[in-house]
Structure formats: structure tokens, C-alpha cells
Amino acid sequence: MKTFTATPETVTRDWFVVDADGKTLGRIATEIALRLRGKHKPEYTPHVDTGDYIIVINAEKVTVTGNKAQGKTYYSHSGFPGGIKQISFEKLQAHKPEMIIEKAVKGMLPKGPLGRAMFRKLKVYAGAEHNHAAQQPQVLDI
């Protein structure tokens, strides 16, 4: 019997919706990253994108433990001298709450073209509404 190896043509992808209301950032991000990679499936193959599509709603209501709301800092750099910018978790949650979950999940995915393809299957929304009803997503309880 031959070892099964998934190919891009044989992969079946499902759509799941995750409610981030009151959930801890790291715990929800690890489960999302695992499902984007496809490691929960028996046909997982490391060099093939076997993961599912994940829709995250209520990103503005995600929580962090301890005093990380004030102490956690996100950095970005323009590439020019003196071009570093920083923003706290609280301010980022007020302005762009989707970015918090996106950055947490992106850091848990592989680096390179395959990781970027996996990341494209993540859809994050600040509120409770999303525009993927046509895909009939299943509710995923994390």
C-alpha cells in the first residue's frame, strides 16, 4: 500500500466561522493557525495547503490576560531612518481590531509562499457581520 500524499486537486476545503467575543488572543490564534494549515485533517501534507477557510467575527472583543492591554506594543517600520512606529494593544484595538488577530495568526504560520497562501484564507471582521453567507460556514466553537 502506498503512502497517501495530498495534491492541490484532491484537497477539499470547508468554511468555518469563529466568534472571538471574550476569547483570549493566543488561544484562539493557535487554533485558527492549526486549521489554516490543515493539521487537524488526516490527509495533512506539509508541502500542500490542505487547510480550511476561517472567518473571525467580533475581533474587537478579543481579550488578553494580565496587563498586556496596556503593556503589549506592536511595532512597524517604514524602512527609512527613524521610521519606527509603535502602538499599544488598546489603541490598535480601538482603531483596527482586525489587525490584532491577523498579526497573531500570521506569526504562527510558515514563512514563505505556502504560508502566505494559508494566510489568505483568513477573513477577520471587527463586528458580528460578515459577507460570506453564500459559503454556508459552519460554526466552530473554540
From Swiss-Prot:
HAMAP family: Ribosomal_uL13. Part of the 50S ribosomal subunit. This protein is one of the early assembly proteins of the 50S ribosomal subunit, although it is not seen to bind rRNA by itself. It is important during the early stages of 50S assembly. InterPro entries: Ribosomal_uL13, Ribosomal_uL13_bac-type, Ribosomal_uL13_CS, Ribosomal_uL13_sf. Pfam families: Ribosomal_L13 (PF00572). Belongs to the universal ribosomal protein uL13 family. The keyword Coiled coil does not apply. It comes from Shewanella oneidensis (strain ATCC 700550 / JCM 31522 / CIP 106686 / LMG 19005 / NCIMB 14063 / MR-1). GO terms for molecular function: mRNA binding; structural constituent of ribosome. Keywords: Ribonucleoprotein, Ribosomal protein. NCBIfam families: rplM_bact. This is Large ribosomal subunit protein uL13. One of its GO terms (biological process) is negative regulation of translation. GO terms for cellular component: cytosolic large ribosomal subunit; ribosome.
